[in-house]
Regions:
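Conserved C-terminal alpha-helix-loop-beta "cap" of PLP-dependent enzymes
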Residues: 3, 283-359
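Short coil/turn segments at secondary-structure boundaries
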Residues: 47-48, 244, 332-333
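Conserved PLP-enzyme active-site core in the AAT-like
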Residues: 1-27, 53-68, 72-260, 272-280, ...
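A structural motif shared across PLP-dependent enzymes of the aminotransferase-like
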Residues: 20-31, 42-49
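Generic C-terminal helix-cap and adjacent flexible tail
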Residues: 360-366
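Shared catalytic-loop signature of beta/alpha-barrel
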Residues: 263-271
């Protein structure tokens, strides 16, 4: 009996993406093997953390790196590192640090909720959030005006959750931060390029280990050596509650080692198969859509005409979730009549099942 049956947990066909609430990723054989082997022995955790940092830094082309429990933990730790500088007295004070220099500047459009509000991560790291600009507009002078002697860092977010309209480009914010001798912390949780942002000049870059990298629940921080050392010091303070087990560290190393070996051809094959299968369904307009945040991700886009289908996109999405098998779509724009099917977490065999289920639901409603 498999664990899903043993504990009565339903499997899901994930057409939504690398979502935490759906378990983020499916692990490869190599990652599972690394985790299994890690679970058979004891290890000196400090040595493992050192070696993991060296390996990750090599792949990210950064001065140094460290493992963390996830991208949200990475934000907390990075903020704490920028504020404390690794001073052990201050490390023990986080999040209630007794210094004035703890302001973290972030654009209003980047104050996202990824399942928890980013402002809470800043606060847990001891930071005092300073918001600049408005939701749909931010200029360099907004940042300039906010910087003062009590500013510890600037936090920038690369995410599909963030508003993309009329924001200051990352390259310009990096230049601005360095002009004022401030570290630029980048939340790149689900980003796919693990070298680009270090090469651009970001001081700390945070990635999820379980999203694009397809590793176990984990995260990593890459960047300047002095700041990474300060990040590591947080394990004596707030990061103690966010420690990572040896199994997940080895799993992350296996994932990053094989990263980039996955072919995008299979993903495009899935998208094309969905478009071909559903293009003749009345009331659906089906096409291929590129990721709106600019990543090289292509998804099947379903536009639901309620007057023809007898239901809107929200209703279709709900029926897919409530059916058997359970199917999750990428429903961020369901209120606008749009559902996306993301091929990255899908198996080719899922395609026929998902398309058939959509046809069945719409056939009943017509």
């Amino acid at each position: 009996m498999c664990v899903f049956d043993e504990f009565n947990v339903q499997r899901v066909i994930n057409c939504s993406g690398k979502m935490t609430y759906l378990g983020s990723s499916i692990l490869s054989d190599k990652v599972r093997k690394a985790m299994d082997e890690a679970g058979t022995s004891y290890v000196q955790m400090e040595e493992l953390m050192d070696r993991a940092g060296e390996v990750i830094a090599d792949y990210c082309r950064s001065e140094a790196a460290c493992v963390c429990a996830g991208a949200s933990a990475g934000i907390i730790i990075s903020v704490a590192a920028a504020i404390t500088g690794g001073d052990e007295r201050l490390v023990e004070e986080v999040p209630y640090v007794s210094v004035k220099r703890k302001k973290i500047i972030i654009a209003c459009a980047h104050q996202i909720d990824f399942g928890a509000p980013i402002r809470q991560m800043i606060a847990l790291g001891g930071g005092e959030m300073v918001s600049v600009g408005t939701v749909n507009r931010c200029y360099p002078w907004h940042y300039e005006k906010a910087i003062d002697a009590d500013t510890a860092a600037i936090l920038y977010v690369k995410s599909h959750h963030a508003v993309q309209t009329d924001q200051v480009a990352l390259a310009d914010v990096i230049t601005l931060a360095h002009k004022h001798q401030l570290p630029l912390i980048l939340d790149a949780a689900a980003e796919e390029d693990i070298t680009k942002y270090i090469e651009m000049g970001c001081d700390l870059v945070i990635y999820s280990g379980a999203k694009a990298l397809e590793g176990p629940t984990s995260g990593l921080i890459a960047g300047r050596k002095t700041l990474i050392q300060a990040c590591r010091k947080q394990s004596k303070g707030v990061a103690r509650a966010m420690k990572v087990g040896k199994e997940n560290i080895f799993g992350l190393l296996a994932a990053i080692k094989q990263y980039g070996s996955h072919s995008s051809a299979m993903q495009r094959q899935i998208v094309d198969a969905i478009v071909e299968e559903l293009k003749s369904v009345k009331g659906l307009t089906v096409s291929v859509a590129k990721d709106h945040a600019g990543r090289e991700i292509y998804r099947a886009k379903l536009e639901v005409d309620e007057t023809v289908c007898g239901m809107n996109a929200l209703m279709l999405d709900q029926q897919l979730r409530n059916g058997s098998p359970i199917i999750y779509t990428r429903n961020h724009n369901a209120n606008l009549g749009i559902l996306l099917l993301d091929p990255r977490p899908m198996q080719l065999s899922d395609t026929a099942i998902v398309c058939q289920r959509i046809k069945e639901i719409l056939a009943v409603s017509l």
